[in-house]
Amino acid sequence: MKIQADDGDIYICKYLTQLQREEIDCLFYELVSHDLLSWLGIRSPEIALMEVDPLHLDSKKIFFNKRLLRQKTWVLAVKWLQDTELLTSLTGISKRSLLKKFIDPYLLIKIALFDLWVDNVDRGVNREGLANYNLLIHARLIDKQVKFTWVPIDHAFCFGGVTKLRILNPSFLPEVAHKLPESPYFQKYYKLLNKEDLHQIIDNFLPLSSLSGIEEIVNQAYAQIPVEWEVPKHLPQRLINFLIDEARVQRARYLIKDRLR
């Protein structure tokens, strides 16, 4: 659902639409993932928790989920980012001259590592071989030159998505199958990178000494969510245990290095 908020900006709003109540956890996943990306210095669209009042909705435009017209509903609102294009299977990157136009050419490596770390099952290649990148290419004017950056979006299916709802634990080690490194775009992209710098980026990603900050990030995200969502109180600790597991972090690094040989 797209709405214009009181601040005049456009937001894409996400809310529970299925009968399976546990899927509300995915909105919590999205909030946690956004904060983790910010902590890692990876920009994603701004998000906010927003209470939508039926009085502000046009009933003629609400074709599904009529309950939105009957009661106030808490939603996760993602701010619409201007000057962006959605990366698709038709998008290619095959020349270093194009890669140099990106503000941080190694950012996609960091996003791939992030996806393995948090088990993002919604960015990569599906079992039918179709790519779903959930990445925007954002154009920015810097010193009178147009520069680009990748912006990751849609993180509701991190932490294993709906198939691992409320059973997530550190024994679920990262796997590269169907993830971003297997996508055609990534396969062309990484071959353009300096291998020495590439390995340095991987080795420095998420230093184990920094994992102590994870607990505060997850707990602060949980403190923000509405009580109406009824997200279990034990879920934050489950996510924390999953994220701070050193074996999982090390395996994420290994998988990326192995894929880039």
Locate the predicted segments by residue:
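Phosphate/dinucleotide-binding and metal-coordinating scaffold of catalytic cores
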Residues: 1-261
